[in-house]
C-alpha cells in the first residue's frame, strides 16, 4: 500500500476489484475477473461474491487498497459532510449508475420504481443530472410522504397499478423518457402477491419508444423461496417483445462504484446533493444493528448508517 496512510478517511466501495484484469481496466469493477473463483464480481458479505467478509463490523480488511479506496482530500471538510459521504460506498453510486444508464439528462421525464434508499438515491441522481420531472412510485405511504418532502413527485400504487394512468395524472401523458427499477425480483403486484417480473413489464409499458431502462434492483439466477417454479430458476415472465418492438435499452448488473464515487464525492463536498437528508440517514451503533435490520425490513423510511466507533455521530 503506497497511497493510503494511517489516519486517512476513506470510502470503501462494496465491490472488491483487483484493478488489473480486463474488466477492471475498462472501468467495470463490478465484474472483476480475479477476486472470485466462482464467477466474475466480488463484494463484501454477500453470497457467491468471493467469500469476502462483510463491512458491517468494527474492522474490515480491504484488498488492493490503493486501487479500491477513495481518500477524502481534506479531513475537516470530510468530517463536516461525513453522513453524506457514507453513502458513497453503495447506494449513491448505485442510484447514479441507474440514472446514467437510463440516459437521464436535461429535461428528462423520469419514473423510479421503489421508494427505498436506492430509489431515493436514483431520484436524487436524476435531479442532479437535470431531469425536469422525477416521479417515484411505491405502496409504502411513509416512504412516499418522505419522497414528497424531499422534492420528488410521489406515485401511490395502493389504489391501482396502472402505472401509465398514474403518470398521466402528473405530466399529462402516460409515458416517460427514463425508467429506473429500484425494486428487483422481490417485487409484488397490487394486492401484495409475489410478481418478480411486474416492474420490468411496467417499465416496458410506460417507457417511450427508444427510451432507456436502468435496473439497479437485484435479480437472481435462482430464487429457492419463490412460489413460482420458473422464478425459482431465475426465469421471469417478461413481455420482452414489447421492449424490443419499442427499441428500448436495458441496463442491468452491479454498479461499478469506482466509476462514479470521486465525482459524487465532489458533488457532496460542494453542496450539490444532500444525500443524507434525501435518504433520511439515521446513525446507529453496531450494537443497535439488529433492531435497525428489523425496522428497515418493516419498511421504515430510513437509511441506517452503522457507526461502530462513533466517528460519524461525533462529527455530526
Residue ranges and their predicted role:
Residues 18-113:
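NAD(P)H dinucleotide-binding glycine-rich loop of Rossmann-like/cofactor-binding domains
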Residues 128-133:
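Conserved S-adenosyl-L-methionine
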Residues 119-120:
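N-terminal Rossmann-fold NAD(P) dinucleotide-binding loop
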Residues 160, 174, 191, 254-316:
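C-terminal hydrophobic helical "lid"/dimerization subdomain
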Residues 1-16, 73-81:
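A glycine-/small-residue-rich N-terminal strand-loop-strand element
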Residues 102-104, 145-247, 290, 313-316:
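Glycine-rich cofactor phosphate-binding loops and adjacent beta1-alpha1 units
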Residues 138-139:
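Conserved acidic E/D residue at the C-terminus of a beta-strand in Rossmann-like folds
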Amino acid at each position: 500500500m503506497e497511497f493510503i496512510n494511517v489516519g486517512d478517511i476513506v470510502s470503501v466501495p462494496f465491490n472488491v476489484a483487483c484493478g488489473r484484469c480486463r474488466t477492471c481496466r475498462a472501468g467495470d469493477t463490478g465484474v472483476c475477473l480475479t477476486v472470485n473463483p466462482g464467477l466474475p464480481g466480488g463484494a463484501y458479505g454477500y453470497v457467491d461474491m468471493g467469500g469476502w467478509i462483510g463491512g458491517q463490523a468494527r474492522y474490515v480488511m480491504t484488498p488492493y487498497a490503493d486501487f479500491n479506496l477513495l481518500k477524502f482530500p481534506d479531513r475537516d471538510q470530510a468530517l463536516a459532510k461525513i453522513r453524506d459521504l457514507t453513502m458513497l460506498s453503495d447506494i449513491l453510486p448505485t442510484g447514479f449508475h441507474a440514472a446514467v444508464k437510463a440516459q437521464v439528462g436535461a429535461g428528462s421525464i423520469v419514473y423510479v420504481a421503489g421508494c427505498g434508499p436506492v430509489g431515493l438515491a436514483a431520484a436524487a441522481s436524476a435531479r442532479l443530472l437535470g431531469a425536469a420531472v422525477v416521479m417515484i412510485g411505491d405502496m409504502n405511504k411513509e416512504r412516499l410522504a418522505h419522497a414528497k418532502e424531499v422534492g420528488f413527485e410521489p406515485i401511490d400504487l395502493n389504489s391501482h397499478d396502472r402505472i401509465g394512468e398514474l403518470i398521466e395524472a402528473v405530466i399529462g401523458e402516460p409515458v416517460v423518457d427514463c425508467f429506473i427499477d429500484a425494486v428487483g425480483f422481490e417485487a409484488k403486484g397490487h394486492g401484495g402477491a409475489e410478481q418478480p417480473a411486474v416492474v420490468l413489464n411496467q417499465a416496458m409499458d410506460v417507457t417511450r419508444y427508444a427510451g432507456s431502462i436502468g435496473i439497479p434492483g437485484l435479480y437472481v439466477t435462482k430464487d429457492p423461496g419463490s412460489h413460482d417454479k420458473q422464478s425459482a430458476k431465475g426465469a421471469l415472465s417478461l413481455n420482452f417483445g414489447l421492449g424490443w418492438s419499442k427499441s428500448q435499452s436495458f441496463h442491468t448488473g452491479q454498479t461499478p462504484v469506482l466509476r462514479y464515487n470521486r465525482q459524487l464525492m465532489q458533488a457532496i463536498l460542494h453542496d450539490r446533493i444532500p444525500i443524507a437528508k434525501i435518504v433520511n440517514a439515521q446513525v446507529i451503533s453496531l450494537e443497535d444493528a439488529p433492531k435497525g435490520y428489523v425496522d428497515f425490513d418493516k419498511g421504515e423510511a430510513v437509511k441506517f448508517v452503522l457507526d461502530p466507533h462513533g466517528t460519524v455521530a461525533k462529527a455530526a
